[in-house]
Amino acid sequence: MRALLSTIGSRGDVQPLVALGEQLQALGLEVRLCVPPDFREWIEGLGMAVVPIGPEVRSTGKVDPLATLTPQQQRQMMEGTVASQFETIGAAARGCDIIVGATALQLAAPSVAQHLGIPYVFVAYCPIVLPSRHHAPPVLTWRGDAPPPAMADYRALWAKDAQDWNAMWGSIIDAHRAALGLAPVGDVRSYVLTNQPWLAADPTLGPWPEPDDAATSPTVTQT
């Protein structure tokens, strides 16, 4: 059995997937990782195959690249990011039996898994990534977000967050899905996070606040 583990981020995003990969290897699985090129030499030294994706994170860690761009340049970068993901993850996933994606920039992996007819699992490292009436969505300053008041209506904020996901990524993702013969995505955030994500966080330090409103929250498995 072969598993593809994919993330786009810095060391804190990559290392948990590497730990998962080592455990899967110990169980006899073949593991392949899609990660930024910075980590290739280290991970290959652990006996796992690496397919580089995205830019080196060292070059983007000091300044948020989107914060310094015009809206048109932001759109071009977003389109390029999605196109690169569909190409890279699409090639890396060939011959794999499952895709595990971590961090919310997994914009192509769910479509690639659907196209190949294999399972896809999204993993969050912190409860705040996942919709819940008990906390606010992540604050993205480059998008113009500001921290909400302590007693804000979190459900309304999550509803707006879903609208923002659709506005930012919907048409870009749907264009690539159409090329694969897949239907458009109605809810981009749910498409990325899935309805049954894993929460890889210590249940004491980062517990999932159950019970919750099933109409607005996914069914979370805390690992």
Enumerate the language-model features and the residues they cover.
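Short, structured coil segments at secondary-structure junctions
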Residues: L46-G47, L116-I118, L193, T216-P218
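Structural motif
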Residues: R2, D97-I98, Q196
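Generic beta-sheet signal
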Residues: C34-P36, I53, A102, V123-C126, ...
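Conserved nucleotide-sugar donor-interacting segment of glycosyltransferase catalytic cores
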Residues: V82-M151, T204-G206
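Phosphate/nucleotide-donor binding subsite
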Residues: A49-I98, P147-A156, I173
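A nucleotide-sugar donor-handling region in carbohydrate enzymes
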Residues: C34, K160-T223
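N-terminal subdomain of nucleotide-sugar transferases
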Residues: M1-A49
